[in-house]
């Protein structure tokens, strides 16, 4: 009973006051880890349009950005990044706002602009390149809001407590300090596959975001990072099995699993 009271007190403090304000060193650490996962750390992938997708991916987090009029099941994150930067008075190209759609309507148009090094492409690339610390800071802010967002979708109080406990077990050391590896794991997965709260991010009514990973963690696995990685692999395997065959998601399994292996402590 005493443990439960202590946990609820600490849980409440963590949820309300996480305030993941990263130091410059932590921003650099997160930026490099996430960017290595998303684009192998190579500048040529800072603005990219993957084969088989109808949208572009930008920055260290490969934040999704839609062309004008495009509707997609996945969360459009790049406008959220721009809004975060605008709040901090970050200089941007004059044509760029959080409401601006991706400047090119098709991958062919984008590739012509990239290969031709058009002015719009140059300005966008320079902006992305110069703001990587802010992008890392945005990733931390997004994680900061992830647990409250997840808990709002859960009605059962015991389940809320379980999910919060598992989240905090990854993020914090026993003394309440932030575990930097756990910080990376959570930031990377939320950026990679989302919070798991968006109803459109489902196949056959089954999601694959952070919520679903936390729900399916094996409580008997003593290594917290292995437990998270194993659950994430299971959720993404389920996603592949449920995905429309025309999307060909099996081709991503190996790369996804390699990414999830970086969550293990070597």
Predicted regions and their residues:
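N-terminal secretory signal peptides that target proteins for export/translocation
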Residues: 1-2
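Sec-dependent N-terminal signal peptides
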Residues: 5-14
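Cell-wall polysaccharide-cleaving catalytic domain and substrate-binding groove, primarily
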Residues: 19-266
């Amino acid at each position: 009973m005493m443990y439960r009271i202590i946990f609820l007190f600490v849980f409440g403090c963590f949820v309300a006051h996480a305030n993941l304000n990263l130091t410059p060193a932590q921003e650099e650490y997160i930026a490099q880890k996430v960017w290595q996962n998303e684009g192998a750390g190579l500048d040529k992938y800072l603005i990219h349009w993957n084969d088989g997708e109808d949208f572009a991916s930008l920055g260290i987090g490969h934040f999704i950005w839609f062309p004008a009029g495009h509707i997609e099941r996945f969360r459009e994150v790049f406008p959220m990044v721009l809004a975060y930067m605008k709040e901090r008075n970050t200089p941007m190209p004059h044509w760029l706002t959080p409401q601006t759609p991706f400047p090119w309507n098709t991958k062919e148009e984008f590739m012509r602009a990239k290969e031709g090094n058009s002015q719009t492409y140059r300005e966008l690339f320079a902006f992305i390149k110069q703001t990587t610390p802010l992008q890392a800071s945005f990733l931390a802010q997004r994680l900061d809001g992830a647990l409250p967002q997840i808990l709002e979708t859960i009605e059962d109080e015991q389940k809320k407590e379980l999910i919060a406990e598992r989240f905090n077990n990854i993020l914090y050391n026993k003394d309440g300090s932030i575990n930097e590896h756990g910080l990376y794991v959570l930031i990377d997965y939320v950026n990679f596959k989302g919070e798991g709260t968006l109803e459109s991010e489902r196949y056959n009514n089954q999601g694959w975001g952070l919520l679903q990973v936390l729900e399916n963690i094996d409580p008997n696995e003593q290594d917290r990072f292995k437990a998270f990685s194993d659950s994430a692999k299971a959720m993404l395997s389920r996603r592949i099995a449920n995905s429309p065959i025309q999307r060909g998601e099996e081709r991503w399994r190996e790369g996804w699993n390699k990414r999830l292996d970086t969550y293990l402590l070597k």
